[in-house]
């Protein structure tokens, strides 16, 4: 592979400083003894990350005067807390990641059961596409919230969104309400995960950051074994609903203390005079209007609508609600395509603040990393969307064993991420490892899955492919995050991570759509071609019923052989698409700058 009273009283938002410009403190901002120094001509030509490093060298014990409010708050906290407090905070961040990983692992195991119970198994792609697009696009406003309001405030907001999503999932009574709850749940999950990543970036030096990011993901190693067992227990002892309901109670209690820690040290810095909060001078109504423009709500809506209307029809086709030749399918795709032009026009001529920071995105390292993220997630979800069902049916596994199969990537990538993080700390570079090790392993793993994907092949070969993909993914995910963070200043880190999140989500959504289209056009035909004549009338119920219906046919029977054959054919085309798209990763990584990570990016007590 994971958020209040700011409206009336905060500094006016300072526009992000484009590369090549000189940052200036807003009028009336208290300055330290050195802030009167005027930058020389060379300073104006420094890169964004170089100017940030110079600011840290000149004012290491002061809050950055011209930074956004959220950045000032986290700098103030970092300047006053002790090393013990940092380590204790990291321990609690690890606990938060553990609970997120556990809940996510359980959800991944019970979601197929829920949709099969609704007799709507193919509709699983609808919920995934919606949540991936909406959650991905909203990452950019979330990054702005973190800079404009503060990390703790944003964290509490999205803990609330996440909890509401869990409650809806626990109480839903059909695929439509499940999809609505799943979207809210995934928005909250993605936002919390992003904010925890930003917490880690805020409290670690750049040289150690690859390791700290990887270490923060190690809970997925633990939950790889516990989540399938927990999910199996929920399904056996209660229902899948309690798999969500229990965490609707647990998660707010576990997550909220982290926000309290950051607020406590922020208030301590205020008492010490390191950070002074300036009133904005706006009324409540003016603040609402200000944030509507600052977050570019209209731009966000246009971009979400464009992607949803372009990709969702492929999911609807997979469950029979819209054929490719139908007017509804064609209209949605055309309107979605046209909305991209509407978004471009809005951004160019009407938006006061652009939804996307194009100055950052035009940097070759940032653009290359974003393309790599989209490519990686597209490739992964081309075969992963129905991988749970495939393993359950073709290899006749129970819920726990299937859960272990689907967790191989999490275990392998998180383990290898720690090794890669230590490698980056030692060598101080990451580009060539991604290009000559991580990407080839991904291509090898996806390519071998083209062959090893049916009942005639031992499951051990599938596990081997998953390990290759896991080690490649563990390298590339950390590498692309390091690439964008190394090219940014501290204030740009949330936005950079949001870019990676946005492109990952959009790539994943396209992968979901491709997987759904392959499943729709391959599985039913392959199934019907192999079913005995007396069972052909059951083809639709077998297709719609998912693995719960398909497993009722005994292994070795003609019907089960036909089902297994259909799964093998469907997975083959998904693996072909996954392998082909990874070729784009070669130029995407090649354009990265070969950054040396042995430099300062943050102020205060760090790891």
From Swiss-Prot:
Please name the InterPro entries in this protein's record: MFS (IPR011701), MFS_trans_sf (IPR036259)
Q: What does this protein do?
A: Major facilitator transporter involved in ferrichrome (FC) uptake.
Q: Name one GO biological process term.
A: transmembrane transport
How is the protein disposed in the membrane?
Answer: Multi-pass membrane protein
Region Disordered, annotated ranges: 1-46
Write down the SUPFAM superfamilies for this protein, in alphabetical order. MFS general substrate transporter
- Traits of the deletion mutant: Leads to lower ferrichrome (FC) uptake activity, which is reduced to approximately 60% of the wild-type activity.
Ordered alphabetically, the record's keywords are:
Cell membrane, Glycoprotein, Ion transport, Iron, Iron transport, Membrane, Transmembrane, Transmembrane helix, Transport
The top of its lineage is:
Eukaryota, Fungi, Dikarya, Ascomycota, Pezizomycotina
Q: Give the chief site where it resides.
A: membrane
Q: What upregulates this protein?
A: Highly expressed under low-iron conditions and down-regulated under high-iron conditions. Expression is regulated by hapX under low-iron conditions.
Subcellular location per the Swiss-Prot or TrEMBL entry:
Cell membrane
Q: Please report the organism this UniProt entry assigns to the protein.
A: Aspergillus fumigatus (strain ATCC MYA-4609 / CBS 101355 / FGSC A1100 / Af293)
Q: What is this protein called?
A: Siderochrome iron transporter 2
Q: Which family does it belong to?
A: Belongs to the major facilitator superfamily.
**Transmembrane stretches, start-end:** 86-106, 129-149, 152-172, 180-200, 210-230, 242-262, 297-317, 326-346, 367-387, 404-424, 432-452, 459-479, 499-519, 573-593
A GO cellular component annotation here is:
plasma membrane
MF terms per GO, please?
transmembrane transporter activity
